Amino acid sequence: MYTTAGMSSVPLTMPSPTHPVAEGDPTPDALLVDRLRKGETAAGEALVRKYYQPLVRYLQRLVGNEQLAEEMHQQTWLSVLEHLDRFDARHVTGGFKAWLFRIATNKANDYWRSSGRERAAKDGLRRVTDEQLPPADFRMEGTEQEQKLKWAIEQLPDAQKQVLMLRYYSNLKFIEIAEMLGCPLNTALGRMHKAMLKLKDLMAD
C-alpha cells in the first residue's frame, strides 16, 4: 500500500508479481485518472492492474533485473501519485499511458546514470534483444540467424535501440514514443529509420 504527502487519502495496493493481473481494463484512462484525483482508491488500483504487466516487463528489459524492475514499478507509481495534479491529458500526446511510461523511462535513466551503473545499463539493453520480436523483414528461422540479428541490434547506438524496443516490444505509436523519450516526433522517426538501415546493412554482411 502506497501513499504520498499530496494524496495521503489515496493508498494504492501494488499487485503481487506471483499473482498476475488481467490487462485491458475497458474503463478509459482519463476517467480513472479523474476518479483517482477525487480520492477513489479503486480507480488508482484499476490503473495499476491495467498497466502492471506491460510496465514491469518494460522496466525489466531496461534494467535487466526482475527485482529491480519491481522496485522501479513501485517508484513509478509513487511519482504518479506525487505529480498527478500536474498531469493534463490535453498537453500530453498519448495520454496517461505515455506519461506513465515516460516516468518509468526516467526512473531507468536515473539508474543508468548513477555511479557505477554504466555497465548494467548496457547489459539491460542487450537483454532487450533476447525476447525482442524483430520487424517482419528480419524474422528468420534458425539459431544462427537469430543470433546474428541479436548481434546486429547490439551494434545500434543506445538511442536507436530504445526506439526499436518501444516500437516492436511495447507496440507503441511513434507519437507515444516521442512523448516518452521527451524528443520531437521527427527525432524518434529518424532514429528508427537509421536503426532499420543499419540493421539491413549488418544482416546483409
Question: Which stretches of residues belong to each language-model region?
Answer:
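Intrinsic, short, N-terminal disordered tails of RNA polymerase sigma-factor systems
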Residues: 1-38, 46-50, 119-161, 165-166, ...
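Short, charged helix-capping/linker segments at alpha-helix termini
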Residues: 23, 37-46, 56-75, 185
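Sigma70-family region 2
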Residues: 37-38, 61, 77-93, 115-116
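Amphipathic, Lys/Arg- and hydrophobic-enriched alpha-helical face
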Residues: 48-66, 83-86, 153, 202
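Structural recognition of an alpha-helix C-terminal capping motif at a helix-to-coil junction
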Residues: 71-78, 94-106
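Arg/Lys-rich amphipathic alpha helix in sigma70-family domain 2
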Residues: 85-86, 102-123, 142
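DNA major-groove recognition helix of helix-turn-helix
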Residues: 112, 192, 199, 203
